[in-house]
């Protein structure tokens, strides 16, 4: 659930989005997806104002992830849409399980490091247990079948990105069952995004105008 700080920020952002919608200031898909992103960032525990530093908000998402991790065995893929989240997750996992246990894989990861991370993750003898990646970067074309758990810290509204990232652990060579876990804040945009993805709906093409209002209310 959201913390009181998150609830306050979420309600304020939602009301602002409704005002924009009523004033006709969200006539494009891009503007609506931007508001979706801002609401989702709050559920993840931060606010990123335009041209301003990230403002962390007290949240339960990271503790919830650590509780999930404590209950699983083996290697895990953790997908997160925002670099800020990837860095926070890696820091928490490194503190709990050791720096060698975790690797970040996102747009700023050096090309030379990317293959090395994949090789180490796939090596059952390697201490690298947690692959924390952005689905747009790590979700395409690489094999990560060493994982038996896939956790979505948050979800992109891009259906193709979700499907591709799911497949990283479920490719040829996977000999065990894979558990998929979604971290979701109840009664927020998180639930709407996950519901759409499970229904194989690409939000980037469908959420406009009154559809978006229905999501907010």
Role assignments for model-derived ranges:
Residues 157-217:
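A conserved SF2-helicase RecA2
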Residues 76-78, 89-92, 121, 149-151, ...:
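A generic "structured core" feature
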Residues 1-142, 209-217:
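Conserved Helicase C-terminal RecA-like lobe
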Residues 106-110, 154-159:
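Short, acidic/turn-prone active-site loops that include or flank metal/cofactor-
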Residues 9-13, 92, 117, 146, ...:
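Alpha-helical scaffold elements adjacent to nucleotide-binding pockets in ATP/GTP-utilizing enzyme cores
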Residues 1, 82, 117-118, 152-156, ...:
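Bulky hydrophobic/aromatic packing residues
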Residues 142-155, 178-182:
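A short beta-strand element within the Helicase C-terminal
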């Amino acid at each position: 659930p959201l913390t009181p700080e998150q609830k306050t920020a979420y309600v304020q952002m939602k009301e602002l989005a409704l005002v924009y919608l009523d004033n006709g200031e969200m006539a494009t898909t891009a503007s609506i997806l931007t508001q979706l992103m801002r609401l989702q960032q709050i559920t993840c525990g931060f606010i990123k104002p335009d041209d301003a530093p990230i403002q962390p908000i007290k949240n339960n998402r990271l503790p919830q992830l650590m509780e999930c991790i404590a209950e699983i065995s083996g290697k895990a893929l953790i997908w997160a849409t925002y670099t800020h989240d990837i860095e926070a997750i890696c820091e928490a996992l490194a503190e709990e399980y050791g720096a060698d246990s975790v690797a970040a894989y996102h747009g700023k990861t050096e090309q030379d490091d990317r293959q090395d991370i994949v090789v180490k993750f796939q090596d059952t003898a390697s201490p690298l247990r947690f692959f924390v990646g952005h689905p747009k970067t790590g979700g395409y074309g690489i094999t990560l079948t060493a994982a038996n758990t896939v956790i979505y810290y948050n979800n992109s509204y891009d259906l193709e990105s979700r499907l591709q990232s799911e497949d990283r652990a479920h490719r040829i060579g996977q000999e065990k069952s894979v558990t998929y876990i979604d971290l979701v804040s109840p009664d927020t945009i998180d639930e709407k995004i996950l519901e759409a993805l499970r229904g194989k709906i690409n939000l980037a093409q469908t959420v406009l105008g009154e559809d978006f209002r229905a999501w907010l209310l």
